[in-house]
Structures are given as C-alpha cells and as structure tokens.
Amino acid sequence: MSAPHWLSQGTLVLASNNKGKITEFEKLFAELQLPVDVIPQGQLNIPDAIEDGLSFVENAIIKARHASKISGKPAIADDSGICVPVLGGAPGIYSARYAGDHGNDAANNEKLLHDLKPFRNAEQAIQGMFVCVLALVEHAEDPLPQIFQGFWHGEILEQARGEHGFGYDPLFWLSELKMSSAEMSKEEKNKISHRGQAMQRFRESLMTRE
C-alpha cells in the first residue's frame, strides 16, 4: 500500500500550544523518524481553536481542522484529559480548565481533590483514567479524519506526589508500579501513557501502509 498523502507534504502541524504536550510529542515523534517536519502551531502563529465539542474526539478534530485551515498543511491534534467515574466522568473534556482558568494545573488538581472528598474511604481507592485522542487531517475539510485513541487506568491520590510531567500527573497513582505518573521519567511515561498508547496506534497505521 502506498504511503499516505500527508507524508509527502513536508510539514505536519502539531495543533497544540500546550508546552507539556509539545514536549512529550517532540520525543514521541522523534522516535518515529517521519520524513516530515513536525511543527507546533505556535511557531506558525496559529492561536488555539475554540473547543466547543462534547467529546475528546470532536475537540481533537476541531483543533486539527483549525490548524490545517490556517496553515494550509496537514495537521494532527491531541485532545486529552482525565475521567473519574465517581464524578460522572469529570473533569473529562474540561480537564485543562476544570477550576476555571485554562492550564492552571495547581488549581485544577486542588479542585479535583476537593470534589473527591465525599467519595473517599479507607477500603476502596478512587479509580481514574487518562484519555488521549489524536486526530489527523490531510487538509482542513478532510472527510475522513484518522483517529487514534489511548487509555491509561490508575487511581487518584489524596495528595500530590512527584515533580515530573504536568496536569494531573501528580495525582495519578499506578499501583502496580508503586509510583505516580509525576514520579516517572519521560521515557518511562511515554511507553505506557495514554498519549504513548495513542501514538502507538498512529505508528501501527503507518506500518500497515508501508
């Protein structure tokens, strides 16, 4: 099967201005050694899209189309967050602005801890799941966006642990590893995280086209 058209375009726009995400993606894309330059949209002066979808998939597509329309290039976008079943799936798509201000990690973590207090008990841990959805469009009106998803299951701690990562990493406990995701190295995290898993699906899609 022939290579996808976007690989011949020379540039793939990464539709994100989130420094934490960009750092992780730069590492993940470097491992793929794609024959294109992956450029964060900020380098092209592309502002954030208005995320008015009701799901991770919708918002990922919105962001990818937005970046592709302005740049005229293929684009890939990530929409991700943490879902806590006892909160009805919240923070969900509102993870980055859960406490009000977009990207205020400390405030978001504090609100999550506060909201979980009524559900805490000594017998049972509170489950949570990181979700990542990648959407790739070859052009702004691409009728068939490619979707790649990753899910990372863990528990929500009662207090922050670790200094690495970003977002809710300090509250995300991996019982089998006896550490939070904020205590993992970038390399360790990328191997098993929701974003790493979504990128693995992306990698597999490229292999099927070789």
UniProtKB/Swiss-Prot annotation:
It comes from the Bacteria. It catalyses: XTP + H2O = XMP + diphosphate + H(+); dITP + H2O = dIMP + diphosphate + H(+); ITP + H2O = IMP + diphosphate + H(+). The active site is at residue 79. It holds the Pfam family Ham1p_like. Mg(2+) binds at residue 79. GO terms for biological process: nucleotide metabolic process; purine nucleoside triphosphate catabolic process. Its cofactor is Mg(2+). GO terms for molecular function: dITP diphosphatase activity; ITP diphosphatase activity; metal ion binding; nucleotide binding; ribonucleoside triphosphate phosphatase activity; XTP diphosphatase activity. Its EC number is 3.6.1.66. SUPFAM superfamilies: ITPase-like. Substrate binds at residues 16-21, 80, 166-169, 189, 194-195. Keywords: Hydrolase, Magnesium, Metal-binding, Nucleotide metabolism, Nucleotide-binding. Binds 1 Mg(2+) ion per subunit. GO terms for cellular component: cytosol. InterPro entries: dITP/XTP_pyrophosphatase, ITPase-like_fam, RdgB/HAM1. Belongs to the HAM1 NTPase family. Homodimer. Pyrophosphatase that catalyzes the hydrolysis of nucleoside triphosphates to their monophosphate derivatives, with a high preference for the non-canonical purine nucleotides XTP (xanthosine triphosphate), dITP (deoxyinosine triphosphate) and ITP. Seems to function as a house-cleaning enzyme that removes non-canonical purine nucleotides from the nucleotide pool, thus preventing their incorporation into DNA/RNA and avoiding chromosomal lesions. This is dITP/XTP pyrophosphatase. It comes from Acinetobacter baylyi (strain ATCC 33305 / BD413 / ADP1).
